[in-house]
Amino acid sequence: MKNLLIFLVDDDAMQNQMLRDHLTLELDDATIDVMETGEACLAQLDRKPDVIVLDFNLSSRQSSALNGLQVLEEIRIKHPSAEVIMLSGQDKLDVAVEIMKNGAFDYVVKSETAFLRVTSSIRKVMASRKLKRQLAATKRLVGFVIAGFVAIVAFCLIVWFFIPEWIPERRIRLGLD
């Protein structure tokens, strides 16, 4: 796995530290930065994180703070290639649907298996990106093959129509032999 940049954004410092410790053990070559506000995350987007694990309810300390959905919307505008995994204490289907409609890669409910699900989602993000890179490489290769085929056909047509003396049967038809 290449060096990943992961942002953990949660206003619960203990939750952040536990998740960071878990991910550090589970993911090789990952740089994990912890932020306690959505605003701090948005200010760091120029660092181009691969994955952002974002708490849905970020306004528990400051009522004026952006919530997770607002931060997600800003991330989609400013750094659309970052994959966002929304972490929430809410187990409500309508919230999960809204989050996914707004472009989250996954929605994980805070529970005893949440850290395992976050790890699994991060691995899925990386597998998806690897497949996209492989698909792009395959498309480029197919483009080269098609271009080569077109060049060969063009060469054959040029030879056939413009240089008849190279082809023995055409030489005979043209009375060159």
Located regions from the model:
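Conserved acidic carboxylate
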Residues: D10
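Two-component/phosphorelay signaling modules centered on CheY-like receiver
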Residues: A13-D33
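Acidic, metal-coordinating helix/loop segments flanking the phosphotransfer/catalytic sites
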Residues: V34-V51, F56-S59
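Short amphipathic alpha-helix used as the core "switch/output" element in two-component signaling
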Residues: N57, R61-S81, E98
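Alpha4 helix (beta4-alpha4-beta5 surface) of REC/receiver domains from two-component response regulators
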Residues: L66, Q70, D91-V108
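Receiver (REC) domain switch/output surface
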Residues: R117-R129
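C-terminal output/effector regions of signal-responsive regulators
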Residues: A136-D177
